[in-house]
């Protein structure tokens, strides 16, 4: 179908590769909007249903392959997460949690990350979408989208910051089966600590996070945190202050990411599009417009490298839906009209009923000198990467057995949770104090960009940090052996048919080890 068809407007103007049409797939499960963190909690999965409704009424669903993700299984999650943590998530319920107080404390499940009905199914759903998106990119799609994913704070053995399972790490591990190097970019207002930590000692994954830094959750992401051992200079942190606007943000994003693409040369890119960096977010303090936020998507799309777009934070949910709808249009090369089409959530977008909202007049505390210093320092770090790492091709491990089914016939309101969309944006939010309370306990591993004195014992430290987490052939941080593909594995591109992986295919060796900060 032509990109200009449907109710959305005109195609984006062609500007090099950015104007070209892309093969896009989109993962959505109608059940995801039913999950409910609880009364007063700012995280509302219902925003995914609102986004989907806008995509439908803008005519975008007809322009991409719409897929229902297959739920990730225990063994899929255990490619990164600890077995006992996954077992706990599977077993705990609101009725049984009082009998598991020690486990709740051990795995950091509680106020920020509550136990709610269907918790494990929720984790399986959003993780399955992200891993499924990675599989689609490995098989020729240009862009894969999972707005339910992007939960970047989850650690190997604990929940954090509203996140239970780190779908991003799992998706990157899947991409590493086909690509020598994978780039992770995070534009959520909060530092992407869980992903950075997982790949802190490898040169096969570069992580770049643009975030609010200071007395703000999770308290990590200092510009001096650059990676360790083989991963030195492969972690980039861009610390920002309150009120940053589109112009200031792009004055950093484009030169830094342009240089990253030049020196790292990734085979695939994962972009976490947390919408809490938008102006007016309930938990945020930035001043980005939707167009400014989406400019990051547009810029990364222009490199014509396989791109996985994920969600993340975002707590003024009417603006989250606006943002991710518009960014889906950008992914498709399709400029959407500002006047919003009638839809089942139309009343929530008043009084203007437009796709875009104006940023506020809040003060931009990021001075020109500060921005120039950050840009100069990070570009200098990138100049120390003389060449992109290479990896020898050997036998490839079996890919994730995550069949999807077409979503066209799904009823998006089936089994609708009565409370999931009652509390929209007007409920007084939980303040950031609970999340901030953990900042004082965070011990960040830092390595100065100017000092190489610690390099001599780098291998020893890395070995100690990764002891017991060396990957099996099919993943990082798992003690399990590779699971052979069997006749029950479903084909990705043709739901319902059978697919068996050949035994003599190629594999990327040297899967990165998981780095656990202590």
Swiss-Prot record:
The record marks 315 as: Polarizes the scissile carbonyl of the substrate. Plants over-expressing HDAC1 exhibit increased growth rate and altered plant architecture. Plants silencing HDAC1 exhibit narrow leaves, reduced diameter of stems and reduced plant height. Its main location: nucleus. GO terms for cellular component: nucleus. Residues 22-333 are annotated as: Histone deacetylase. Its EC number is 3.5.1.98. Keywords: Chromatin regulator, Hydrolase, Metal-binding, Nucleus, Repressor, Transcription, Transcription regulation, Zinc. Zn(2+) binds at residues 188, 190, 276. It holds the Pfam family Hist_deacetyl. Residues 413-435 have a biased composition (Basic and acidic residues). The gene is HDAC1. Binds 1 zinc ion per subunit. This is Histone deacetylase 1. Residues 503-518 have a biased composition (Polar residues). Belongs to the histone deacetylase family. HD Type 1 subfamily. It comes from Oryza sativa subsp. japonica. Induction: Down-regulated by drought and salt stresses. InterPro entries: HDAC_PDAC, His_deacetylse, His_deacetylse_1, His_deacetylse_dom, His_deacetylse_dom_sf, Ureohydrolase_dom_sf. The keyword Metal-binding applies. Residues 401-412 have a biased composition (Acidic residues). Residues 387-518 are annotated as: Disordered.
